[in-house]
Amino acid sequence: VATEKDYQNLINSFESQTWLIKLSPWGMRLYLTLLEEEKADKAILLRDIHTLFEAANYSSQSPQAKIFKPTKGKLSKYEGYKEKLFNDAYEGTMDEEFLKLVKSLDRHYYHVAIMELLEANIPLLQRFTTSEDKIIAQRATSLIEAIKHPKIYPISQ
């Protein structure tokens, strides 16, 4: 059974400045998968998912995000990325073409991907709102509310 330190090490690796941008959507997928494991500490996972969601939400409202202008090419790349990220049958193989796409994807889309991935997984999260463990139920409810009604940050340029 994983300890809280194990979970903290996992989220710390996802939050490192160098990797947060590129790993967070895949880290989020890992967290969602772990939520379905019987022995996983769901209270810790839900807390950490909420942390990553808030980071993505904040970053999506940054001055750089506000001036971001999507193009057909950028949207096409994001759709290709999303196709694998949202595909439960995708086994994780990253061929040369997909690695090239990941490296060229604008960082704005990594934040958007986290938010969209969580929104798509609200049905999974709702299963935990009725948990007998009050902490799990409260964290799941709080996370769903945050996803449905993202906080608006007063960010100035």
Model-based region annotation:
Residues 9, 47-52, 124, 139-146:
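Core register positions within helices of long alpha-helical scaffolds
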Residues 31-32, 124-126:
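Buried hydrophobic core positions in alpha-solenoid tandem helical repeats
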Residues 142-157:
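Glycine-rich, aromatic-bearing surface loops/beta-hairpins
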Residues 1-37, 41-69, 109-113:
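Alpha-helical solenoid scaffolds in large eukaryotic transport, assembly, and signaling factors
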Residues 54-125:
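Acidic, serine/threonine- and proline-enriched intrinsically disordered linkers and terminal tails
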